[in-house]
Swiss-Prot record:
Designated name of the protein: Cystein proteinase inhibitor protein salarin
UniProt PTM: N-glycosylated, with sialylated biantennary complex-type glycans.
Cellular compartments annotated: Cytoplasm; Vacuole
Tissue expression remark: Expressed in the skin, liver. intestine, spleen, pancreas and kidney.
One Pfam family it belongs to: Inhibitor_I29
SUPFAM superfamilies associated with the record: Cysteine proteinases (SSF54001)
GO molecular function: cysteine-type endopeptidase inhibitor activity; protease binding
Keyword Amino-acid biosynthesis: no
Residues spanning the signal sequence: 1-19
Cellular component annotations (GO), alphabetically ordered: cytoplasm; extracellular space; vacuole
Species, as recorded: Salmo salar
Record keywords, A-Z: Cytoplasm, Glycoprotein, Protease inhibitor, Signal, Thiol protease inhibitor, Vacuole
Superkingdom field: Eukaryota
Length: 342
């Protein structure tokens, strides 16, 4: 089948799909839109067969425009498109020189999508379904890339990746465990985690000035590791569309990572919140070093809860979270069975 042409006000994009009216529009509305377009551009055809053929090309162009503009609305494109007088023409019929050259970055992304499909065994029932899934995949990819850019710049303490669920909406991802049980570690497990920490230190050239400093940093590292593991467990069971990983910032606090200290007022408020929480749950610690370590874990828990609740406000989570008496414990320290399961 001949390629179909989308010619915009300032550019042309080629489509190889003959489209039906989009589901949200009635056939009568789309037909009226086509008739209005014909009048606007003085279009007439020698036969009903020719008009039917041209309308199919116009529909494909219209669909492409709407999909592009949806991406633009989501920040995935830097411009919007519109249908003009060449929207019912094939590539061969468009005047020479009006078709744009393919952008290398688009070809690379298309290749990446094809490789991802192959890797995850993805097939779709129609070109329309594939186009829809690709749009979701592109949105996930953009979100992951933006996060990883922040990680490169030191604004995040972990990296993300694409997985099998990256072409699904949040509602479509199988609802699995919202929280994960990590059993209490025995001696062997603890030794494995200690070995993992030592390997991470060597990999990232980490040295600490004292055993107290190392204990503090290990506490932060464990909190980051726990958050990453819980997220990736949800990704495995389908509750997240990407995976995370550790990096050289995993032993740092949020303030250290971002390079931004809390303002005096903010710091005082957070400190007051921590002190209030300690009183509420009867928390005391044997040393200032231990308290500093527990406060870092509490801060990481608080941050995770706040981020989750922000997503809940935006409709991306179906429940809200709160900080409780386990908020200064790592997942390994929380008694077995106390993490909620769906």
């Amino acid at each position: 089948m001949k390629s179909l042409v989308l010619l915009l006000l300032v550019a042309v994009t080629v489509s190889s799909v003959v489209s039906k009216p989009l589901p949200e529009d009635s056939e009568a509305e789309v037909h009226k839109e086509f008739e209005t377009w014909k009048v606007k551009y003085g279009k007439s055809y020698p036969s009903t067969e020719e008009e039917a053929k041209r309308k199919e090309m116009w529909l494909a162009t219209r669909k492409k425009v709407m999909e592009h503009n949806t991406r633009a609305g989501n920040g995935l494109e830097s411009y919007t498109m519109a249908v003009n007088h060449l929207a019912d023409l094939t590539t061969e019929e468009v005047p020479k020189g009006l078709l744009p050259m393919p952008r290398p970055e688009e070809e690379e992304v298309d290749k990446e999508f094809e490789m991802w499909k192959t890797h995850n065994g993805k097939t779709y029932n129609s070109t329309e379904e594939e186009a829809k899934r690709k749009e979701i995949w592109l949105a996930t990819r953009a979100r992951v890339m933006e996060h990883n850019k922040r990680a490169e710049n030191g604004s995040e303490s972990f990296t993300m990746g694409i997985n099998y669920f990256s072409d699904m909406t949040f509602e479509e991802i199988p609802k699995a465990r919202l929280m994960v049980v990590f059993p209490t570690r025995d001696g062997g497990e603890e030794a494995e985690v200690d070995k993992e920490f030592e390997t991470w230190k060597v990999q990232h050239g980490k040295n600490y000035g004292s055993t107290e400093e190392e204990a503090k940093r290990k506490g932060i590292w464990l909190a980051t590791r726990t958050r990453v593991m819980e997220h990736n467990k949800r990704a495995e069971t389908g509750s997240e569309s990407f995976t995370m990983g550790m990096n050289h910032l995993s032993d740092k606090t949020t303030a250290e990572v971002t390079g931004r200290r809390l303002q005096d007022g903010e710091e005082a408020e957070v400190h007051k919140e921590f002190e209030t929480w300690k009183v509420k749950y009867g928390k005391t610690y044997p040393s200032t070093v231990e308290e500093a370590k527990r406060k870092e874990i509490w801060l990481a828990t608080r941050k995770m809860v706040m981020e989750h609740n922000k997503r809940a406000e935006n409709g991306l989570e179906s429940f809200t979270m709160g900080v409780n008496h386990f908020a200064d414990l790592t997942a390994e320290e929380v008694p077995r069975g106390l993490f909620p399961m769906e």
